[in-house]
Each structure stands twice: as C-alpha cells, then as structure tokens.
Amino acid sequence: MRTKTIGLIAHTEKAGVAELTRAVVREFEQRSVEVLIENEIAELADEKAAGSPEEIFRRAELIVVLGGDGTILNVVAHAGENLKPIFGINVGF
C-alpha cells in the first residue's frame, strides 16, 4: 500500500530546518505524495500551510518529524487518538 498523504512537523528553532523542510517537501511531491505542513514551519520555510498539528494528525497517513528526540516524543504525546506511524529525522543534538 502506497502512502498518499504525509504530515510534516518540525522543531522550528533547529538550524537549517527551513531548508530541510523544503527539501523533504520536494522529494515527496516528486513522488506524487501530498505534504501537509504544520502552520509554523510552513511560514518559516515559505511553504503552503495545512493547519495545526491536530489537523495534520487527522488527515495524514504518516507523520514526518524534523527535530530531536524531544520533538518526536512531543509529537507522539500530542497525537492522542489520531496517532499514526511516525518517521523521525534527527536534526540536532
């Protein structure tokens, strides 16, 4: 089964996260995957926003998290009953 929609959530204070966000978005879009970007990171990366983390949890099939361990754990804690598979990309120490 192919994933058609992913959510993208990131720690906005990590160095280089805006550039990494744009690169991740391009990679998924080239593969015809819709990317739902959380409002705050979308603004930082100059990308189209999809909504709050809660909205992204509801709509996405997979959540991609850009950040450290704390960011990933925070996403899991806030997903509630809408928890989806999470793919973490560690961008810090």
What are these regions (language model features)?
Residues 1-13:
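Generic N-terminal amphipathic, Lys/Arg-enriched alpha-helix
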Residues 14-22:
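Glycine- and acidic-residue-enriched helix-capping/strand-helix junction motifs
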Residues 16, 42-43, 48-93:
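Small-residue-rich beta-alpha loop regions that form the catalytic core of phosphotransfer
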Residues 16, 29-30:
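Short, basic/aromatic recognition patches that contact phosphate-bearing ligands
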Residues 21-25, 76:
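Short amphipathic alpha-helical segments and helix-helix/interface helices
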Residues 25, 29, 80:
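Anion (oxyanion) recognition and catalysis
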Residues 33-40:
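Short internal beta-strands
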